């Protein structure tokens, strides 16, 4: 299990106890700094004060459990307009929206695709309508995915 998934399982109860959805978390390095980025949401969106409240709660859990070696920066925010997609339920929730995905391994010489989310089946296979074809991808083959903000309406 990846460290991000371990962290997700560790902090999810604290986030949910406050009445928020833990959309996902990512652990990465930016220069010499380790960053734990946590995305939280609720119906109607989440504000700055609520993010601060969640940050304090997560910090308390992480201080006790100490799952990250060394120093790190905790960033808690809303997922934003181009929110990340992690689970089959995220894809289902945004059927009809445009997304960009990056695959773990290339398909037909390509790793990145953009298209409309049209379906997610019970086997957790995501179907995207690309410009000129349909792409079906098992969720486990997707390395990273985000919605594409549509400002044209």
Curated annotation (Swiss-Prot):
GO terms for cellular component: cytosol. The gene is rimP. It holds the Pfam family RimP_N. This is Ribosome maturation factor RimP. Belongs to the RimP family. Keywords: Cytoplasm, Ribosome biogenesis. It is found in: Cytoplasm. GO terms for biological process: ribosomal small subunit assembly; translation. It comes from the Bacteria. Required for maturation of 30S ribosomal subunits.
